[in-house]
UniProtKB/Swiss-Prot annotation:
One of its GO terms (cellular component) is nucleus. SUPFAM superfamilies: Homeodomain-like. It comes from the Eukaryota. InterPro entries: Caudal_activation_dom, Caudal_homeobox, HD, HD_metazoa, Homeobox_CS, Homeodomain-like_sf, HTH_motif. Residues 201-211, 228-240 have a biased composition (Low complexity). Belongs to the Caudal homeobox family. May play an important role during the early steps of organogenesis. It is found in: Nucleus. Residues 192-248 are annotated as: Disordered. GO terms for molecular function: DNA-binding transcription factor activity; DNA-binding transcription factor activity, RNA polymerase II-specific; RNA polymerase II transcription regulatory region sequence-specific DNA binding. Residues 137-196 bind DNA. Keywords: Developmental protein, DNA-binding, Homeobox, Nucleus. The gene is CHOX-CAD1. This is Homeobox protein CHOX-CAD.
């Protein structure tokens, strides 16, 4: 093969397997070569000699058909010259980005990023302030009707621990879930234990207060006599010592 400044050194093409392709540019035949660039004798040939199927110029254009097709999409940005042509040029510049990538860049504006959380906060503030209950209480707290409480109380007096079968039947009859029936029975048993504990405390308090209290000091006893406990306090057997003090 003939050396050429356009050919990549790693490419090896055989002229026997070469099939010439259509020219990429309409004015390609009128291009004028500059003689004396290097020692290649084919650079000095006229433009008409390029029409032969095994000339180096057409082989170069066929081997770099992909790069020429990408350069043809933007013909105003490039000026073709064989010594300056580089097959790696489309990957170096930032202006040859795909249209999808370059078009998506202006959509990410800082105003759109700041606007989204602000609108989300504005929508969430009225929802939290309007309702006094939290999500957990709204989800799990159930307000039973009078009919439901009556039927549940009847079942509780019959059996403090409801069976699985009866729980399913009662939930279907009252329009509740089995979990709601189970929670009601758990709360009802806890309430019963609390009431029984309070009753036991009330029963133990009167027994401790029935012990007799001793009579007060100085109270008259039966037959108009004084209590024995009041005698020592009235008559004192110890002599009184009087200390006289004189002023000088």
């Amino acid at each position: 093969m003939y050396p050429s400044p356009v050919r990549h050194p790693g490419l090896n093409l055989n002229p026997q397997n070469y099939v010439p392709g259509p020219p990429q540019y309409s004015d390609f035949a009128s291009y004028h070569h500059v003689p004396g660039i290097n020692n290649d004798p084919h650079h000095g040939q006229p433009a008409a000699a390029w029409g032969s199927p095994y000339t180096p110029a057409k082989e170069d254009w066929h081997s770099y058909g992909t790069a020429a097709a990408s350069a043809a999409t933007n013909p105003g940005q490039f000026g073709f010259s064989p010594p300056d042509f580089n097959p790696m040029q489309p990957h170096a510049g930032s202006g040859l980005l795909p249209p999808a990538i370059s078009s998506s860049v202006p959509q990410l504006s800082p105003n759109a990023q700041r606007r989204t959380p602000y609108e989300w906060m504005r929508r969430s503030i009225p929802s939290t302030s309007s309702s006094g209950k939290t999500r957990t209480k709204d989800k799990y707290r159930v307000v039973y009707t009078d009919h439901q409480r009556l039927e549940l109380e009847k079942e509780f007096h019959y059996s403090r621990y409801i069976t699985i079968r009866r729980k399913a039947e009662l939930a279907a009859a009252l329009g509740l879930t089995e979990r709601q029936v189970k929670i009601w029975f758990q709360n009802r048993r806890a309430k019963e234990r609390k009431v029984n504990k309070k009753k036991l405390q009330q029963q133990s308090q009167p027994t401790s207060t029935t012990t007799p209290t001793p009579p007060a000091v100085g109270t008259p006893g039966p037959m108009g006599t004084l209590c024995s406990g009041s005698a020592p306090s009235l008559v004192s057997s110890s002599p009184l010592t009087i200390k006289e003090e004189f002023m000088p």
